[in-house]
Amino acid sequence: MGCGASVPVDDDEIDPFLQDKRINDAIEQSLQLRQQNSKKGVKLLLLGAGESGKSTVLKQLKLLHKGGFTQQERRQYSHVIWCDVIQSMKVLIIQARKLKIKLDCDQPNNSLIPYKQIILRSDPLKQIDADVAGGTDFLNDFVVKYSEENKNKRRLKSTGTTDIWGKDDDSNINSDAINQALESSLNKDSEQFTRLSIAEAIHKLWKLDSGIKKCFDRSNEFQLEGSADYYFDNVFNFADTNYLSTDLDILKGRIKTTGITETDFLIKSFQFKVLDAGGQRSERKKWIHCFEDITAVLFVLAISEYDQNLFEDERVNRMHESIVLFDSLCNSKWFANTPFILFLNKIDIFENKIKKNPLKNYFPDYDGKPDDTNEAIKFFETNFLKINQTNKPIYVHRTCATDSKSMKFVLSAVTDMIVQQNLKKSGIM
């Protein structure tokens, strides 16, 4: 009899239970790696210039993964919005005169005169609980936004150039300055009116005074709350002292972000820590404290602000400042290997704007069709992608941060991408 060469036999072929054990061990190891990675967590940094909508993105994350807003938050926004709706109408009346727009309520014997007088003599701070609205932070922001003294101070400090790391510091107004400003410019000649009479006055001026609408159409030329028209349309809701802000009210409302806020979310078994840093110049010097161990940067840009100037310096275009800011962050040593997610936000407002204010007036190198929204957005997408001088990926999304339906889709895509990248780093995928 001949003899053949022996062939080694795999133990798995002899013992199927051993094969099952190896498979189970591999699965267990994979699960342990995933668990360790989820414990380590994901750090998402929200950045962008002031009023870009990044805090609205955070609000949408709360709606999706935190069960929405508390009763306290709803009360707070009701107070803040009531103040802003009154002050926004005051701003329109004052700015119309500066822009030499004829107001019906300024004409002799016009039936709208009493409504104008109510608005100009109203003091919203006498009608709310400042502590519920945010205490000192709220009063600080209110004075910064609406005090003529602070507007004049900003004009005097204006350089007309981008100052991305911000040496201006409007946020550090002390309590004496707050009290002085409130007693002088804000409370001057004020009277106590009922909320209903104020709401009626705002409603009449908004609906019937053609000059107010003309002034609103030119609001890119001065500083006005971005949701002022929404406030005016719903003014009777906000006039109700028992009214609790809806989700949409809160998404439309604005409370200035000061410092750096941290919010934790559990998304797909991963711990997400989202850091929202104040975007105005005076806040940016604080950013450096949250640059370490960042998984991804979410940079929010209000594309609709191509024709507006900064609140901090009315000689600087908001879009130009955002471009320089994005450049400094994207190409920073801190984020050399950190993926960037770019939200081109407020596209709904942008679509309406470019039909009235051609993009080429502000960006002469744009050679697309004047009223082609898609072409105009692509212009910005291309220019922002060109800024990247590294090999890291940049993911661009077109967003309307106040639209919960579309943001649910976008944020799901973003969090899925971040989770997948973390799994790849762990060797699980």
UniProtKB/Swiss-Prot annotation:
Annotated region (G2 motif), positions in chain: 249-257
Cofactors demanded by this protein: Mg(2+)
Binding site for Mg(2+): S55, T257
Any single biological process term in GO: G protein-coupled receptor signaling pathway
Region (G3 motif): 272-281
Lipid anchor positions (S-palmitoyl cysteine): C3
Family annotation (CDD domains): G-alpha (cd00066)
Binding site for GTP: E51, S52, G53, K54, S55, T56, L251, T257, G279, N345, K346, D348, A401
Region (G4 motif): 341-348
Region (G5 motif): 399-404
Residue ranges annotated for the G-alpha domain, each copy included: 40-429
Keyword Signal: no
A molecular-function term among this protein's GO annotations: metal ion binding
Lipidation feature positions (N-myristoyl glycine): G2
Keyword GTP-binding (UniProt): yes
Keywords: GTP-binding, Hydrolase, Lipoprotein, Magnesium, Metal-binding, Myristate, Nucleotide-binding, Palmitate, Transducer
Subunit structure: G proteins are composed of 3 units; alpha, beta and gamma. The alpha chain contains the guanine nucleotide binding site.
Summary of the function given for this chain in its UniProt record: Guanine nucleotide-binding proteins (G proteins) are involved as modulators or transducers in various transmembrane signaling systems. Involved in the mating pathway.
Family recorded in the similarity comment: Belongs to the G-alpha family. G(q) subfamily.
Designated name of the protein: Guanine nucleotide-binding protein subunit alpha
Source species taxonomy: Eukaryota, Fungi, Dikarya, Ascomycota, Saccharomycotina
